[in-house]
Amino acid sequence: MKNIRLIFVLFFILFVYVTYGQHSNPLIYKINIKENIGSNTWVYLQNGMHQALNKNADCILLHMNTYGGSVTEADSMRTAILNFQLPVYVFIDNNAASAGALISIACDSIFMRSAASIGAATVVSGQDGSKAPDKYQSYMRGMMRATAESHGRDTVIQNRDTLIEWKRDPKVAEAMVDEKIVIPGFADSTQILT
């Protein structure tokens, strides 16, 4: 376990060094997200982002391990990350379920330790965790899709065909919410993608 974390830290430092090579010592501001997503987590992220700017950080690293939480706060966190002036990276140290998946997809790069999971973003209601009506699922699918699409796409010409290649596949993001979306090689039509 310690070796895996050490390898990740070394890889991340190399990634930041290559990206921000003009700085001899890039400043990485780490924000831990290791509880359910809610109003406290949202305020914690806002404070961390302000502190990163005040300390002239080069980027933010979210260290994430969450089973999810409130869609409302997750949407606020997603929007803040998408609009933030510094790059925001996420290291998933076990779980980025549900609301955590939405937040992770908003980040500039996603890093995961071996055996970590991301996905299972179906909206649930009440204490029993039953699936919310399709109105809510539709909105969450749209949010996941738009977040993935926000990272852009490349136009590739192959054998006189023009292909669109998404940097983050919006269908994969939607499949984390809707079991009817099939991603070849990942999930069948009876499973939510994780």
Stretch-by-stretch model annotation:
Residues 22-194:
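Soluble extramembrane regions of membrane proteins in the secretory/endomembrane system
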